[in-house]
Amino acid sequence: VANSIDDVRARFRSTAGQSTFDYLMAEEYNDGQEFNIMTWIVDGQAHIISIADREKIAFEDGEIPQVVRCAYPSPLTAELQDEAASIATKIAGYVGLENGPLCVQAFYREGEGLAVCEAAGRIFGYEHELVTLGSGLSVEELLIDCVYDQPAAKARVLAHSPLFATHAAGLYFHGHD
């Protein structure tokens, strides 16, 4: 992570030395709170399944922080769910997704709203198990219903609340030399 143009200049040669290209690409690092947002699209409209905090730690100075825990539900779920659903509905419309999963990773800064960094028509790996632990919604059954019983899938999604009664978290362990 470069915090200034002076940092970029100081690290340019060592960074360029690790590349086969004669240029570097850089992107702005968003240091806002990061979220995993699982939605389910029903008739073109996004419904929030879950919003989880992606908690991160930088293990060394100048390193991009790495995720160490995904905690369900985020304390900001009630505050962010309408904006998240609106964004996911726009994404679904853009790609033509009418029914099924759509997951979004996004950053949030107070006063700036959500900034999407990734969206995919899938569920978040093992995290569907945390949704089941926290809310009781079986994502596996929802996926099966999505294929074999669309009315049942729709009913499951419309009856679901992302404001879980139980907290659940997935931990990530990192090894460093």
What does each of the following model-derived ranges do?
Residues E28-L97, P101, Y108, A120-V147, ...:
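ATP-dependent carboxylate/phosphate-activation module, predominantly the ATP-grasp catalytic core
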Residues F21, E98, A152-A153:
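A general structural signal for well-ordered secondary-structure junctions
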